[in-house]
A protein has these predicted regions:
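Aromatic- and acidic-residue-enriched carbohydrate-binding clefts of CAZyme catalytic domains
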Residues: 1-3
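Catalytic core of nucleotidyl cyclases, primarily class III adenylyl/guanylyl cyclases
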Residues: 32
Length: 184
């Protein structure tokens, strides 16, 4: 919807041009800003209103718009990192369908091909997404690292969580071992 996209662009322009009361500096000129994120967990559940490329096209257009105003800061989509392999392929690979089938209208592989998106921002909520600990969770981290590496882009695992506190320490240790590798 062009009207909604216009409103979003007005919001972006206002935000990036906002002057900090204390420093007198526009946000787009601030060294305190690490990057801009287009949205937190954007989704476009696949139905008659949300076709395959809706979110991709939106991210491509809006990230380019942000860069047209502020070419100096990085931009991310803010998506959860869902894939669009299709239901049959997700089942064939024995992957949790909600995160890999394309149901949410997100295609992490494709989003990482956008030139004006500078890094990936996957999230991971193991029990909410039906992941098996020690299997699906580790595959999720590795697959996202491969995707961003292939796109020659960095990755920040922005959010992750596990409801079961008795398993949390061990799981977090496994996840961080993959992320940090031999660095520590």
């Amino acid at each position: 919807n062009e009207t909604i996209k216009g409103w979003y662009k007005d919001y972006i322009k206002t935000l990036l041009n906002h002057t900090n009361y204390y420093t007198g500096e526009k946000l787009m000129d601030s060294e305190a800003v690490f990057s801009w994120e287009l949205s937190n967990e954007p989704r476009c559940t696949v139905d008659e209103f949300c076709k395959d490329d809706i979110l991709y096209n939106w991210a491509k257009e809006m990230s380019a718009y942000v860069k047209s105003i502020d070419p100096y800061h990085m931009v991310s989509v803010g998506d959860e990192g869902f894939y669009n392999l299709g239901y049959q392929e997700a089942a064939r690979q024995d992957l949790p369908s909600s995160a890999y089938s394309g149901y949410y209208g997100v295609d992490f592989d494709k989003l990482m091909t956008i030139d004006t998106v500078d890094f990936g921002t996957p999230h991971m909520y193991v029990d909410q997404w039906g992941f098996d600990l020690g299997d699906d969770d580790l595959e999720w981290i590795k697959r996202h690292a491969q995707t961003t590496s292939s796109a020659d882009k960095p990755i920040i695992f922005e959010e992750f969580g596990l409801t079961d506190k008795t398993k949390r320490d061990a799981a977090y240790s496994d996840w961080l071992d993959i992320v940090t590798g031999d660095y520590y």
